[in-house]
Amino acid sequence: MKIIAADVFVTSPSRNFVTLRITTEDGVTGIGDATLNGRELAVAAYLKEHVAQLLIGKDPHRIEDTWQFLYRSSYWRRGPVTMAAIAAVDMALWDIKGKVAGMPVYQLLGGASRNGLRAYGHASGADIPSLFDSVREHLELGYKSIRIQTAVPGIKAVYGVAAQAQASGERYDYEPAGRGAFPVEEDWDTRAYLRHLPSVFEAVRNEFGPEIPLLHDGHHRMTPIQAAKLGKALEPYDLFWLEDCTPAENQEALRLVRQHTTTPLAIGEIFNTVYDYQTIIKEQLIDYVRAASTHFGGISPLKKVMDFAAQYQIKSGFHGPTDISPVGFAAQLHVGLAIHNYGIQEYMQHSDKTNEVFHQSMTFKDGYLHPGDEPGIGVEFNEEAAAAFPYQQAYLPYNRLVDGTVHDW
């Protein structure tokens, strides 16, 4: 069996997605996700101009060899554009292998290690009453674990707090990327955030009790001392994790944070390779791996990093907002179902328009996800539907402090 075509599609059903479709001489197709929020066309061009032609004539079953070829042969390694492109190829090849075998991908990874995958949802609010309403809504939807993000007095817009209204009767989760030719500027005040956040978790615990696992995302905005202070202040509220508390580039910061708090730590949604995790896993500076299949090179390296993490009792907490397409999301569900050290899966529901383009076998019931038992990844791409939603330029926002200094968003 040989590959005869590799086609790239950019579509925007509610948001932009980059999809790779690989076709074999036997007519078997596989799809992969190469979406990089705010930089979609960069990955699409990389795939079209530098990768697609290299796949023609290759054996689709040689997944590891193809992965290593794409990673090493260009000499220029790592980085979000390169790794998203490689991820799409890797997913598509696993999809083909599963279809040829007549099995879902998780069976090829060793079979299921559990019956379902615990998921968490995103609750947010401009104030405490609206936050409570959002928590209740997510509990009614079946979520058993909730991420808590809230507005901060004195700050106009805060990451993780939905600003847009619902439209056409459709429920939307938080979408930070703004359509347009330039990113939106937001303001930030870390001291105000640190003063306010513990009282939010106190209020949520008083309202909903001690049993619900609660999570929070710091989004890389704190110094090590600030993160340590926050982790300590949140200890009475028994968080499931504090995510991305310090900038991802400064991994040594986690040593200081770890020394000062027992609040569990998660990081890695902007990591691209297992090498980014080497030190923090070996030194047990984190509790959860936040990598995403789409930005990490695909299914193959995601499974590898989790096998490495298992030696240190570190679990998965894969990145899963709606800027991961249904293809990329399903890919990491297969990994999560197969590995022993699964922790939790972030899950934001895609829009109805997105579901017109990507037909999924995935299910969500009573707080648990399952990738389904269709052969391959379990997602089919509707090219005709995708054509009805052309690309729209979009950017993630950026932060400035009160004095005008650019700050981590």
Curated annotation (Swiss-Prot):
PANTHER family referenced in this protein's UniProt entry, alphabetically: D-GALACTONATE DEHYDRATASE-RELATED, STARVATION-SENSING PROTEIN RSPA
Domain of life: Bacteria
Keyword annotations of the record: Magnesium, Metal-binding
The protein's name in its UniProt record: D-galactonate dehydratase family member Achl_0790
InterPro entries, alphabetized: D-mannonate_dehydratase-like (IPR034589), D-mannonate_dehydratase_GalD (IPR053379), DgoD-like (IPR034593), Enolase-like_C_sf (IPR036849), Enolase-like_N (IPR029017), Enolase_C-like (IPR029065), Mandel_Rmase/mucon_lact_enz_CS (IPR018110), Mandelate_racemase_C (IPR013342)
Stated role: Has no detectable activity with D-mannonate and with a panel of 70 other acid sugars (in vitro), in spite of the conservation of the residues that are expected to be important for catalytic activity and cofactor binding. May have evolved a divergent function.
Chain residues that bind Mg(2+): 217, 243, 269
Amino acids binding D-arabinonate: 219, 269, 290, 319, 346
Phylogenetic placement of the source organism: Bacteria, Bacillati, Actinomycetota, Actinomycetes, Micrococcales
GO biological process: amino acid catabolic process; carbohydrate catabolic process
GO molecular function: magnesium ion binding; mannonate dehydratase activity
The family this protein is said to belong to: Belongs to the mandelate racemase/muconate lactonizing enzyme family. GalD subfamily.
